[in-house]
Regions:
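A secondary-structure boundary/capping signal
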Residues: 31-33, 49, 84, 118
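Generic hydrophobic alpha-helical membrane-span motif
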Residues: 38-40, 65, 125
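Hydrophobic/aromatic beta-strand patches that form the interior of the parallel beta-sheet core
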Residues: 29, 81, 114-116
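Flexible gly/pro-rich beta->alpha loop and the following alpha-helix that scaffold active-site loops
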Residues: 1-30, 35-41
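C-terminal and late-domain segments of enzyme folds
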Residues: 77, 87-144
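Pocket-forming structural segment of enzyme catalytic cores
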Residues: 42-104
Length: 144
């Protein structure tokens, strides 16, 4: 992640961050390492979500696990897959909790930028990806 995106000869992450920052309502879904990038872009700019995060906060690869989480953004439980997952250590006033594991925050959102410490793409449940598509479709329809 850091080797390609922040390499002086690569323009990948700066272009992505510019695209995200260009529209605060643009829906973005960052999972695991993507959540880290949203919280700590590392490009000298402000965080893209109003939260602090600890890399590998849930432990090593051997500590990886699966557990049902309360997905407040979806209004239902969701099968969370945690692989060397980051841990949210604090959230600011602009952050909305989108998911919890027991009482611990595992998902936050600022505007339409959602950061998740787990891997929804490995769960077999498309709920968070459907949220992303619905939000993008609604913004597109509202702009016409």
């Amino acid at each position: 992640m850091r080797l390609t995106g922040n390499d002086p000869v690569s323009s990948l992450l700066p272009a992505v961050f510019d695209w995200i920052r260009a529209d605060s309502e643009r829906p973005v879904l960052g999972t695991c390492a993507g959540a880290i990038l949203l919280a700590e872009p590392g490009d000298g700019g402000d965080p893209l979500v109003d939260t602090k995060i600890e890399r590998n906060g849930f432990g090593t690869q051997a500590d990886s696990f699966q557990s049902n989480i309360e997905a407040e953004a979806l209004g239902r439980d969701f099968p969370g897959v945690f692989i060397r997952a980051p841990r949210f250590t604090s959230s600011g006033d602009k952050a909305q909790v989108t998911a919890k594991l027991d009482n611990e925050v595992v998902g936050v959102m600022t505007n339409n930028r959602m950061a998740l410490s787990f891997h929804p793409e490995l769960s077999g449940d498309s709920g968070f990806h459907e949220w992303l598509l619905r939000t993008a479709e609604k913004l597109e329809a509202d702009s016409k």
